[in-house]
Amino acid sequence: MWILIYLFIIWSSLRTWVTAVDSTTTVGDDLNETVSASVWPTMSPQMTVAFRSQRDVMGNLTIDQLPYVGLNLRRVLLNNETSMVNEGNNTRLLTLFKSMLSSEANAFVLDLEQYNNDLRVVDTTLLFSDVLIALESFIFSTQNNLYANIIVLLLNISAPELDSTEYRHQNQTLNTTYILDKNLGNSFIYKPTDLQSDRAKNNTWNIYGKSSIDGWPTLGSVLYEQKKRLVIGELTDFFNETTAPYIFPHDVFHYEQGNSTLDCPSTVEGLTDLSSIHWRFLDSLFNSVDIKEYISCGLSPIISNSAYVNNVTQLADIIHEGSVWSWDSDQPSVTQSTSKSGSSSGTLEAYNCVLLYYFANNETVTWRVGNCYNSNIGLCRYENMAFRWLVRSNKATYFDFDSYQGSKCPDQYSFNIPRSPLEQRSFIAYMRNSSFSDTQIWIDLNSISVSNCWVSGGPYASCPYEKVISRRNFVTMMVPASVCSFALLCIVVYLSVLRVPIYDNRKNWRRVINKISKSELEGVPS
């Protein structure tokens, strides 16, 4: 019985160890997973980590200020030149749409027309409900902290050719709420009523990080607290609050086609003015060069490059250039473990911290992984001011720049990071005005706690995806317990195999007892 008990203890210890080892590599293992269909090029492990780290960095930005990269589905996928559309190949169209959802694109413009008291995708036989079912499938498969992201669906509704009376009647009888509830469900949709509720609870913010009655909630609040994934908006004026309570009206979005009327800001005042405009979209033709410039100017590009179905995946390069505005082309380096090691020169190495490289000749910046033990200057931000920066001249390791003893940043400043293309543009303006040469600067981003999980919050920030026990701490914790368990097991085995001598010689012991018993007096003493 005792053997079984202690074997169970050992088995439990080993099982816990295996679980902990698996948990420390979960993020790395997830790099090999994919939720993409085979039609669209899948993201590499490096690209997956880069895209996820950007999302996490932007967690405290409001959803209206995020940089979205979108596709105009009618131009890119559902145009009349696509043979699948002419053939009515809806299955393949939906397969390609699902694979687009799994790419870096996170905004889509969809043209719909009213058809028999329903909505149908223009120039196809696809119903709006078919698209919603595909969306629901994708959202369910990515409803976790690793893959979840906000999707914006912008609708262009074509009015039927009817007189005004018939038009009003059909508009009122078209039940969009029923269509959305039946084929997608309202739990994933961030609705106008949700925005009203957030504003009533002071859960909406402006660019200064202060509660605002005309602001929007943060990405982290929408994704992780409210578990919302989809924002639906209308670009036309077909619906109203009564007929489509789940859909935001057209005046919420700043949507332009062709050329933008918004100037690209170069001053803090210009950046602040631009940030006061919500949901800035530009629907136009883009290439892999100019899309980065539009992103850095605070616009969310909607790609309208006409494509054939056989070459539609060539747009993946353009989407990639627009969606990754931070990391260098070969970054971040994907590792299998986080460890501290010594080089041949005897110095410590831990390539788990991020340096922002500034190039003065062309005024560009990029992020690269660096050795946390190297000494560099660091980046500080003034309180909650999104566009006010300070670079400290005193060098320190990543661990020393922002530690428990205090930060190297002065009072009212904190160790920080550009969280969006606009903030990065304001940093470039600061570096230009301060006449900095080419410089490497620590920013608040590292993967010290878990490999490939890049987090902000200093060197002691934990990975948000799960509760993880590091290998180093786990070994320190489990070695004493394992040694004690093994020692107890050895004692039990020893006592079970080697009997105590008194039991090993029972006959002699019984003879001695009988001899002593005979010498005892019997009866009652007189």
From Swiss-Prot:
Where is this chain primarily localised?
membrane
Q: Which PANTHER family match?
A: MAINTENANCE OF TELOMERE CAPPING PROTEIN 6, MAINTENANCE OF TELOMOERE CAPPING
Where are its TM segments located? 478-498
Glycans attached where? 32, 60, 80, 89, 156, 171, 175, 202, 240, 259, 311, 362, 433
Note the topology in the membrane: Single-pass type I membrane protein
Secretion signal: which residues? 1-20
The superkingdom listed in its UniProt entry is Eukaryota
Name the family the entry cites.
Belongs to the MTC6 family.
| Job of this protein | May be involved in telomere capping.
Q: Which InterPro entries match?
A: Telomere_Capping_Maintenance (IPR051008)
Question: What gene, per UniProt, encodes this protein?
Answer: MTC6
Q: Which UniProt keywords apply?
A: Glycoprotein, Membrane, Signal, Transmembrane, Transmembrane helix
Extracellular compartment spans: 21-477
Query: Where, per UniProt, does this protein localize?
Result: Membrane
Name one cellular component (GO) term. membrane
* Protein source organism: Saccharomyces cerevisiae (strain AWRI1631)
The stretches that face the Cytoplasmic side, renumbered to this chain, are 499-526
Q: A Pfam family this protein belongs to? A: TIM-barrel_MTC6
Q: Could you tell me what this protein is called?
A: Maintenance of telomere capping protein 6
